[in-house]
């Protein structure tokens, strides 16, 4: 019974935390720098890219992730590696091989995965300063389904969401269906 109560209190604390208070989740990036992915500090919001190094769809998005990070510098970006078996050395090698520019965080216990309710990789989640979900879903519509890659992107869902958030407008839709590899 104590365990159930402790779990409930912890979960309630995450849900009820005010601005900056949910930033208790601290992850060291691959360079050892402490990062607070739930606290965008002076940025508009945090953008979490849930990513798995063994997922070909995730890897195909590495250049687009870099372009989004470069064009929307008013957001705090993080690549969240979700594979519980990924070592820091292998993650560093993968980040180098795919030229990932955003800070890479390892989430072997799926703390961020659970909090953001991410289900596949790649999946983007945008969280406001108060921890409020602003957007969750696909980066764009390049994939119509598993193994079904379109010839060209026609909808830039994440870019559109970030532009709408930057403009201070209400986002519709708030969620889109991400296509990718199931989170292990």
Predicted feature residues:
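Bacterial N-terminal signal peptides
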Residues: 5-15
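Boundary at the C-terminal end of the N-terminal hydrophobic targeting segment
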Residues: 15-24
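Short active-site neighborhood of thiol/selenol oxidoreductases, capturing the structured segment around
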Residues: 40-59, 162
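Thiol-/selenol-based redox modules, centered on thioredoxin-like
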Residues: 128-184
